[in-house]
C-alpha cells in the first residue's frame, strides 16, 4: 500500500508497551504498529524487496519521510485536538464491541489528552494527541 499511496507521513500505533497507559498497549495495536514500521522501513524503500511490485505492477520503491507513532512512551510531538474532541469520542463510541461498556470513556480520554497537552506546553484547557515522530529519511 505504501508504494501505491506514496505517503510522506505514516501514523501508526506504538509497537512498544506504554505502562503509563495500558489501554494503548493492546496486543493487536502493538502488532499493527510493528507491521507498519516494518512496511515503512525497510520494505517500501528497498528496490530488492518485493521486486514483483515494481516489475509486474509498476510500483516503484517509496521512501516515507516520517512516521508518527501514537501511544508511544517516548512522545515528543503534541497536536492540539481540542476542536475535534467531540468527533473523536463519537468515532470511539461507534466501536461498540470494544467501547460500549465504557461509561467513563469521555472522562478517561479527556484526562489523557489534558495530560498530553500539559506535557506539550499547550495552554490550560487544551487537549492534545501525543506522538513520537521518527525521521525515516536516513
Regions found by a protein language model. Name each.
Residues 1-138:
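Metal-dependent de-N-acetylase/amidase catalytic core
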Amino acid at each position: 500500500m505504501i508504494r501505491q499511496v506514496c505517503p510522506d507521513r505514516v501514523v501508526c500505533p506504538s509497537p512498544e508497551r506504554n505502562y503509563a497507559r495500558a489501554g494503548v498497549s493492546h496486543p493487536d495495536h502493538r502488532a499493527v504498529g510493528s507491521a507498519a514500521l516494518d512496511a515503512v522501513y525497510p520494505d517500501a524503500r528497498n528496490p530488492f524487496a518485493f521486486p514483483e511490485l515494481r516489475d509486474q505492477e509498476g510500483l516503484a520503491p517509496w521512501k516515507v519521510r516520517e512516521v508518527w507513532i501514537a501511544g508511544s512512551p517516548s512522545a515528543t510531538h503534541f497536536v492540539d485536538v481540542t476542536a475535534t474532541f467531540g468527533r473523536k469520542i463519537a468515532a470511539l463510541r461507534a466501536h461498540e464491541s470494544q467501547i460500549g461498556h465504557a461509561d467513563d470513556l469521555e472522562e478517561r480520554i479527556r484526562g489523557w489528552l489534558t495530560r498530553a497537552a500539559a506535557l506539550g506546553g499547550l495552554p490550560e484547557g487544551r487537549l492534545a494527541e501525543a506522538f513520537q515522530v521518527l525521521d525515516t529519511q536516513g
